[in-house]
Structure formats: C-alpha cells, structure tokens
C-alpha cells in the first residue's frame, strides 16, 4: 500500500475494498454510478444537504491540497476544507470523500503514523488500464469465481453490488 500498488477504496459497494492499482479505472467505471446514487440517497436521508456544487467544490479543493504528492489524513483534509469555508462534520466528510473516490479524484495514500491517508489518484496511479464494459464485467466475474468458488450467480451479484441485468 505504501508504494501504491494496492489501494483501499470504496470500489464495488459503499464498503472498503483492497484492489490492485492497475484495476482501479475499469472497476470505478463499473461501480461508480451506483455508489454515488447510494451515497446521495444516504446523504439526503441523513440531512447532509450536499449537492453537485458541493461535490465539485470539494474535488477542486482536494486537487489543490493533495497536489504534488501530498498525502493527508481525513482529519487534515477536514481542517483544510473547513479553512476553505466548507462545513465538514463526519457524515458530510464521509459523503464528500466517497464521492471524490468514485469520481476518480482521490484514492488511498501512504499511511502516516499508522493512519490512512488520501492522495490524488492521477498522481498515485497515473497509468491505470481502462477496459470496455463487457470485458471489465467478464474479468470481474472470472476473478470472483476463481477466488470464491464454490459460489453462485446470486453470490456474485451480492458481492459485486452490480444490478442483476448488468451482472448477466
């Protein structure tokens, strides 16, 4: 993880997953839209009051504060966002950071004093492969069934968070 070959991200569901850095782009393209929808629903239901303008502003601020290989903890990022005038209690910060992950702005950085950090994905993994959707779905299914067999199609759908129609 320190070197960035393995990343910790919300990649298949709104749950932390460890993935190979070279897989991040195609996996994000498969799952980002659903994770953002779940994230938005949760934010709305919990009164976070976030909109697309907030997410865009946060992403721009993250690009500035994490640029140049700067890896910061959540607490440090919260402080920087607050200094820039954004309200960032824990629920809002969770939603903002998950959205930035699914937009491909941030990913896990190198731990600092035993605490996880965030870094810019473009700096941490500048050359990640992207795949057409059909190829990405086939690769995801192949990897799942090789590592989780015996397993059923329903197991794969649950694990991946994919809609049944897309998983077929």
What do the PLM-derived regions correspond to, one by one?
Residues 1-168:
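Long, low-complexity intrinsically disordered regions
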């Amino acid at each position: 993880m320190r070197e960035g070959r393995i990343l910790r991200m919300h990649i298949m569901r709104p749950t932390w997953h460890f993935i190979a850095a070279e897989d991040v782009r195609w996996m994000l393209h498969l799952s980002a839209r659903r994770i953002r929808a779940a994230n938005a629903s949760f934010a709305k239901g919990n009164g976070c009051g976030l909109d697309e303008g907030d997410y865009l502003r946060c992403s721009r601020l993250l690009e500035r504060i994490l640029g140049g290989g700067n890896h910061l903890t959540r607490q440090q990022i919260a402080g920087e966002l607050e200094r820039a005038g954004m309200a960032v209690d824990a629920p809002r910060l969770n939603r903002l950071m998950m959205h930035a992950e699914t937009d491909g702005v941030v990913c896990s950085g190198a731990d600092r004093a035993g605490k996880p950090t965030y870094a810019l994905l473009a700096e941490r993994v500048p050359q990640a492969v992207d795949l057409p959707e059909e190829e990405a779905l086939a690769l995801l299914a192949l990897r799942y069934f090789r590592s989780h067999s015996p397993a059923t199609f329903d197991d794969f759908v649950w694990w991946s968070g994919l809609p049944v129609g897309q998983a077929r």
